[in-house]
């Protein structure tokens, strides 16, 4: 199988131009956001603040090089890809919020928001709260 090698860090990937961090992962969510393109940083800070306000008791960390909120387990993550922001909420949340997610692309527990799309912050807040509640029940 052909592998792509990043010319900057020398890491090998299965896909050409695989999105990744050269070097070490960011130490904080703010650092993650500040490493992204300037034109989406304000959107990412709005997303971060929405999740923080929804579940202030959750720990904010970086896991798998993604902004992550967790308590007992992982609650919600997000990551920037080439063409979208992926909000990793889990398949159970996607199914539970199916009606409110109509018209929003989802795949395997991930909400995919196009970079030029308005972020449904109220919906993300509600999903974060629901996931937090489900996490505490486990």
Task: For every predicted segment, state its role.
Residues 1-138:
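Charge-dense, helix-prone N-terminal extensions
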